[in-house]
């Protein structure tokens, strides 16, 4: 299967029947969420700002948003809960939480492997929501879910939106739905106060990009390169001109993601005028490669601090 960039989001060039979301026996609901305390003090206040409002506040302070991504349930949901606290305590402004899916065609090998491990442990949407219901009140930054469309369809658009909002989720990214097919998604998101973030890419024509930025809520997700997610050695110089084009079309904040893994990447993108920087595979790899969950969380803290400091 190939991924084409259509309408500024990922359009899967594959048969319409997709591999279904794997449902395994639900994990033990008595999850422990108190295993690890980072060196930075943990916040215990509920998020009060949504995505767009977070960017507005940061802009007033002359700051750029740091947005890390991790996969829910890798290596397990208890560790995910602790990771969310660590990311929040280390100064993350928004956190993207990936819902594992069996056919994640927009993702590179690191996040694909994390999704596979998570699904094999029995992670599903219900267990993720149960975890978030307990953890969101303990953190101060908003959570945005990153999920493929299949899990949403399985639950039903309205029920999905209401259930994620009920546990405190503020934003949503659905990478495999082209713009023309987002109308119902946007309607249900609006009805449930969920900010639906849309993506634009280096191959998106200017006129289509303008339609995307007009429809996007929360912020504009600028994909920095063609292809799947994954750390890269450098950031494409095209990002600077893409940012300029988008900012000429909208006043909405723009965050850049895909391939960003180092403090120098973060600093460079911020210098080009991005309102936010998204880092995913580097975070996921640390948690996946660690010898133990505690080691992974400590390494996650170190990386988060180094990336965040590049924006200060």
Swiss-Prot record:
Active site per database record:
96, 107
Reactions catalysed, semicolon-separated, are:
(1S,2R)-1-C-(indol-3-yl)glycerol 3-phosphate + L-serine = D-glyceraldehyde 3-phosphate + L-tryptophan + H2O; (1S,2R)-1-C-(indol-3-yl)glycerol 3-phosphate = indole + D-glyceraldehyde 3-phosphate
The transit peptide of this chain lies at 1-40
Q: Which Gene3D superfamilies match?
A: Aldolase class I
Keywords assigned by UniProt, alphabetized: Amino-acid biosynthesis, Aromatic amino acid biosynthesis, Auxin biosynthesis, Chloroplast, Lyase, Plastid, Transit peptide, Tryptophan biosynthesis
Where located? Answer: Plastid, Chloroplast stroma
Where, by tissue, is this protein expressed? Mostly expressed in roots, hypocotyls and leaves, and, to a lower extent, in seedlings, cotyledons, stems, inflorescences, flowers, siliques and seeds.
The pathway it acts in is: Amino-acid biosynthesis; L-tryptophan biosynthesis; L-tryptophan from chorismate: step 5/5
Leader sequence range is: none
Top-rank lineage group of the source organism: Eukaryota
Q: Which family does it belong to?
A: Belongs to the TrpA family.
Protein name (Swiss-Prot/TrEMBL): Tryptophan synthase alpha chain, chloroplastic
Q: Which organism is it from?
A: Arabidopsis thaliana
Q: Give the taxonomic lineage as stored in the record.
A: Eukaryota, Viridiplantae, Streptophyta, Embryophyta, Tracheophyta
Which gene codes for it? Answer: TSA1
């Amino acid at each position: 299967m190939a991924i084409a960039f259509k309408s500024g989001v990922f359009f899967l060039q594959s048969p319409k029947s997709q591999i279904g979301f794997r449902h395994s026996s639900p994990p033990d609901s008595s999850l422990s969420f108190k295993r690890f305390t980072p060196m930075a003090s943990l916040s215990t206040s509920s998020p009060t700002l949504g995505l767009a409002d977070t960017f507005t506040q940061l802009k007033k302070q002359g700051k750029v948003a740091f947005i890390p991504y991790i996969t829910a349930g890798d290596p397990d949901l208890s560790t995910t809960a602790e990771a969310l606290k660590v990311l929040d305590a280390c100064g993350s402004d928004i956190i993207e939480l990936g819902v594992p899916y069996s056919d994640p065609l927009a993702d590179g090998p690191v996040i694909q492997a994390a999704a596979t491990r998570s699904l094999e442990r029995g992670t599903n949407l219900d267990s993720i929501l149960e975890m978030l219901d307990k953890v969101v009140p303990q953190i101060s930054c908003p959570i945005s879910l990153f999920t493929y469309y299949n899990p949403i369809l399985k639950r039903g658009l309205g029920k999905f939106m209401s259930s994620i909002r009920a546990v405190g989720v503020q934003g949503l990214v659905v990478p495999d739905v082209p713009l023309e097919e987002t109308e119902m998604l946007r309607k249900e998101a609006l009805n449930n106060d969920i900010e639906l973030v849309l993506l634009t890419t280096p191959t998106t024509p200017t006129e289509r990009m303008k339609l995307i930025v007009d429809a996007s809520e929360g912020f504009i997700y600028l994909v920095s390169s063609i292809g799947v997610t994954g750390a890269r050695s450098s950031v494409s110089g095209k990002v600077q001109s893409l940012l300029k084009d988008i900012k000429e079309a909208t006043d909405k904040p723009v965050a850049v993601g895909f391939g960003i893994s180092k403090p120098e990447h973060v600093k460079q993108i911020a210098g080009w005028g991005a309102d936010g920087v998204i880092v995913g595979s580097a975070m996921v790899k640390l948690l996946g490669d660690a010898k133990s969950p505690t080691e992974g969380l400590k390494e996650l803290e170190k990386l988060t601090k180094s990336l965040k400091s590049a924006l200060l």
